[in-house]
Amino acid sequence: MSRHRRPQGFNRTDRVADQIQRELSRLLQFEMKDPRVNLATIQDVTVSRDLSYAEVYFTLLGQGEEAGAEAEEVLTKASGFLRSSLAQGLNTRTTPKLRFHYDMTPERAAHLSQLIDEARAEDRELRPEDDETGNNE
């Protein structure tokens, strides 16, 4: 006999992660009074299969790596408050322990874009004839 398998996609852990992301975003915006996390945006949440842990990835609007590390520390210290607030809205027996991670993807992307722009500018300086002929390969 073959087992019935659920289709790949939006399973229970995905639904719980989505709910945690929405609720944490609301909590950070309206419940947290610390200015170091006011500009935090929850980018992604992944939940372990047994729902015991939630990895929470966040960014800070217009802030650097140092501010991100500080915000990560603040959120880690506030994880008990955040977890108990989450427990009221989640329909699970237990509420996952929250682990916060500062997501440096936007800063890295901006840096890479800047490097590409600089390389293009240097290339144009070294080979200006390509710009005139429209042959930019």
Swiss-Prot record:
It comes from the Bacteria. Monomer. Binds 30S ribosomal subunits, but not 50S ribosomal subunits or 70S ribosomes. Residues 114-137 are annotated as: Disordered. Belongs to the RbfA family. The keyword Cytoplasm applies. Residues 117-127 have a biased composition (Basic and acidic residues). GO terms for biological process: maturation of SSU-rRNA. Gene3D superfamilies: 3.30.300.20. Residues 128-137 have a biased composition (Acidic residues). One of several proteins that assist in the late maturation steps of the functional core of the 30S ribosomal subunit. Associates with free 30S ribosomal subunits (but not with 30S subunits that are part of 70S ribosomes or polysomes). Required for efficient processing of 16S rRNA. May interact with the 5'-terminal helix region of 16S rRNA. It is found in: Cytoplasm. This is Ribosome-binding factor A. Pfam families: RBFA.
